[in-house]
Structure formats: structure tokens, C-alpha cells
Amino acid sequence: MNFDVNSKLKLLFGYINFSGDGMKFLANLTRNSVIWMCMLGCIGLQSAENSGVSDSSEWPTYRGNTSGTGYSPLEQITLDNVNNLEVAWTYSLRNDSSQSAREPNSQATPVVIDGVMFLPTADRVVALDPLTGEELWSHSVPENAPSRRGVTYWPGQGGISPRIFYTAFDQLIALDAETGDLDLEFGESGKVSMGIPYISVPFVYKNIIVVGANTPRGAIGGIGNARAFDAINGSKLWEFESVPSPGNPGNETWEGDSWEGRLGANAWPFYFTVDESKDQLYIPLASPIPFAYGGDRAGTNLYANSIVAVDIHSGEYHWHFQTIHHDLWDHDPPAPPTLFDVNYNGKTTPALGVTTKSGYLFVLDRENGEPIYGVSETAVPQSNVPGEETSPTQPIPINPKPMARVSFTTSEIVTAQDTSEEHAEACRNLVRSVGSITNDGPYTPWTYRSDDSNNETTLLFPGLSGGPNWGGIAHNPNNGYVYVFAANIGTLGWMEDAEPGSPLPYALTGPDGRPSGFSVRINGKTMPCQKPPWGQLTAVDTNSGEIAWQIPLGITEEFPSNRQATGRPGRAGALVTASNLLFIGATDDNRFRALNATTGDIVWEYQMERRGNANPMTFLGSDNKQYLLITATDKLMSYSLP
């Protein structure tokens, strides 16, 4: 941020007179803390004057870089000393001094820039001293809560101070990074209306801010186009039409006027990625809404369920790759592509990897969107819902093999030998209660129950919550591996005639009046009813397209000790470091783990109070110590070596 001396002194000692929009600065410091902070400040000033810590030692974006790799070149924490990690500090994401009823359920990954950490809490955006977790400033968000997923940093330009950008419902908001005050020079008094809600992290590249869209289920009107704004003044730069209007390529994939007013096909990911050598932005687009019935939208429905490459300066279309045609399962790409190079068949190719909730990892040439290891347009089961026109084929990667379970047979129902008699009996009761279970492999459509005499139930794998999810892919440039965490949770459901007056003739439902998980609850915990693993971490060698290793991740303590390694569900992703360590939380057993990134062996774990449902990050502090951080629901956890 290149703070000047006065700015650093303000951050060190606090303001005597509190002012600004919801600002609170630390004051009344003890003599010792003043001395300590002064020493820290002097170090910071000296570092700034001598170019300071290199960019690679910090964590400037949600995934560490604009390629989204989740990789850090730091190697102070190693396979040999990782077992010595201890908690350095914690920071509560609750606002104990306010009357706010907002409860934190944070999925945030902080950013660290020029020795300052920034992140959202339940009802604030805060700047912290990354060595201690002490607040430097706190900005209250009085209306809509800030995105629980993160904030982004813009370094400023031409006399304009650095800014922190965050979203709150449909507002894009700029703060002065040095003070936390609203930056009134941006937009209308520091705010810009995005035109649609977006509850994730704005993506900053040069002087461009890219945001996506969250179109609520059942909403009427409002389109999920990605948009770009000028980081200097907030003016709108471009908008990419994710459901093409007449005259634009792709409109022919929507029969008749089914494109018009169509919801979904929105860019909802937590972040974006860009190829800086080409200024090419990659936009992952979601399923059409409604997703379960597509009889009113015959066709492949571009650009839903696609990765679209555009010019980040203009939004001009370059290419696309559709991962599902005519989606009926809500199995969109939940995270943007991760960018890396592949050495395959004697050729180095600039590539990207993108997962889908359907359990697959697609590796594409990022210059043209062509699959590197091949994709097969595979015949898939067809729907019996009246009026539905299922796509006859779906694109399935030849390599790598699936990251999650994609099929099921009744022989795979869990037994007492797999877990426990109590669990197995509960699952047998569930199976008896739902009637006849159908799964015909990948992309099994929802079966239609025309009347009460039909008791057929579709069991979808992965279920509606998906296999891989928003955590995205981590890439290790040292061995060419990418790492994907996925859950194995099935969904039970069927289509039936909709209630009179409904906008569509058929509706998706299930055993409890809605689609439900193929699982039971024991002692308050979800226990899937198919054989484990229920959560798994996969390493893929991108230089061959083959799976290098795949392990269950997470334990179920309710089972006998020799049956606890079931894997547990989760949605977050991993962090990889140059010391060949992989760090991941994600699982609902509340563990934070380190693994050998080459072998998949677990080498360290820490039992947290709450779930680490967020992507971890790491940075090198001004004390030359490597810190490791993860958000655990309502608390930020920081670890370091002694």
C-alpha cells in the first residue's frame, strides 16, 4: 500500500477523535503495546523504503494469484517441522460490541498486502495486524451484510489511494485501504449498484473490477450476466450476455423465445481468473433456472454450464466450452478455472482445469478451449418426463477419471461391516421407505411419477450439492499435480405434476416433500447410506492426465476405530506450498490437515472448535515467520512455528 509515515503512525497509535462511517480505531494502548507496535511500525517503514517483502510472500488475492492456483512459494513450514505448528493468534468474526443479529458462517479467505490483512466479518470489514490479529481499523456495514467470502484490494493510481472493494447484496463498495472510510470518489459516495446481487469477492485486474451475479431460485426478472466496472470511478465498462439474445451466437440453442428473461446461467463463483499474458478472463456460468425441468427450454442452452473466455478489457467473446448440455441437475462449474501449463505428449500447452459439480475435471487448452486429454460425447439415459428433451449425449472427460462418485448400484448400500449396525439399519429403513431406487449411471434424469402407483425414485450421484465445489483446484508447479476435494453425497428425488397455478407443469420433489439426501442423521451428524468414501481428495498428474493418488479425507468418530476413515463431506479447497505441503480444512469433522503433496500422506492435523469451511492461505510476516491461516466458521485461526 506504500503507506506514508503519518498513515503508519495513525495505524500504530489510533485516532484521538473517532470519525468516519462506522469506524473504530484502537486507542488507550498500554505502554508495552505502544512500544511493541512502534518497533513493528519502524520495521514496516524500513521495509517499505527498501521495497519490503516480495509480492510472492504475501497473499494478495482470494486464491493467492490471478491464476487461481492456491499456491505459495513459501517453504519455511516443511514436512520435517509441520508437526511443530501451534496457534499464533485467533480473531473472532462476531461483533460482540454491537446489537447485530448477524451470525458469522464465514467462508472467507483473507488477503495480505504490504503487511496488512483485510477480511469481512458478520457485519464489518476489518484490517488486522497479520502478526497479532489486532484490529487496525473496522468498518461497520449497517445494512446488507458484507460478502462472507472475502474482499479485494486495488493498489490505487495517480494520486488515488489504495482501496478495498467488497460487495453487500447488489452494492459494490469501496473503502480507503489506509483508514477504512468509504472512498467517496468512487461511484456515488463510495458505492455502485451492480444491478443484481453478488455475494462473492470482486475480482480486480489492473483498473478493472469484475463481478458476477447470484440469481435467487424462483426469482422473476434479473439476469446473471458478469459485469465489469472501472476501479477508479465506478463506471460500467462492459456486461457479458450469458444467455444470448437474438442475432448473437448461441441464441439458436434456446428454442423459440425461451431465452427471454431466463434466470440462471449466472457467474456466481467466489472469484475469477485471468491469463495475464492474453488479458483473457474466464467466466464459469451456472445452470439455467429452473434447472430440474427443461421442457420450456429445448436445446443445449448456451452459455449455461460453460466456461467462457472473454477479453477482460471489453468483455468480447473469445471461446466457450460447455460442460453439460441442457442441465437438469444443477451441476454447474462451481469455481473458476485454475490456470497452469501442461507438459503432455512432448508439448507444453497453456492449460486450465475446471471442475463441475457432476464430478468431472476438464483440462482445456486455454487459448482455444479444446480438451487436452480428450472428451467423449457419451450417450446418457433419457427422461420420461412429458415434454422434456434430454440431451442424447453429455461431454465426459476421457482423462482424468471422475473426482467423485458418479453412479450407484444397490450392492453399494452401506453394511454394518463398513460402519456400524445402527447406521446400516437406519439406511435399510430409508431404502425401504423410498420404494424403487433408480440410478443408470452419470446424468441419470429425474424419473416421473404420474400417480401414486409409481414409487420409482431417482438416486443422483453426485447429489444436488455436487461433488467438487466452490473451493476450486489447487495446482503444484513443482510436480504438475492438481488437487481436487469432492463430497460423495447422493440426492433422492422425482418429478411429479406441479400444483395448479404453478408456472411449470412439473416439479422436483422427494421423500420429505422436497429432494433429500441419501443419508441419515445419527447424533446430529449426516451419515450417507452408500459405502465410503463420503469425502475424498484427489491428486491428478496434469502431465499425463492420470490420477496420482486419491484418499478418503475426514473421519467419522461415531464408528468403531477401525471404521472411522470414511471421508467426510465438504466444499472448500486446498493450499499448496513450495515445501511440498498441502493444507486443507473443508471436512465437517472440524480438522485442519497437512498432507505430503506427492504421496497424499497426512502429516499433521489440528482439531478446531468449528468447521474450516474456507480455503486456507499463507504469508511471510515482517518478522520473517511464515503464518498459516484458515477461517473456522466464526473465528480466524492463525498458525506458525514456535
Predicted regions and their residues:
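Extracytoplasmic/lumenal domain signature
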Residues: 81-94, 125-145, 158, 171-196, ...
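Bacterial N-terminal signal peptides
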Residues: 32-44
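Bacterial N-terminal signal peptides that target proteins for export
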Residues: 21-35
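Short, Lys/Arg-enriched N-terminal segments with co-localized hydrophobic residues
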Residues: 12-22
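Mature N-terminal segment immediately following signal peptide/propeptide cleavage
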Residues: 52-96, 112
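Bacterial Sec-dependent signal peptides at the C-terminal "C-region" and cleavage site
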Residues: 41-54
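Long, low-complexity segments enriched in small/aliphatic residues
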Residues: 394, 398-489, 536
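Repeat-blade elements of multi-bladed beta-propeller folds
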Residues: 59-63, 102-122, 145-171, 198-220, ...
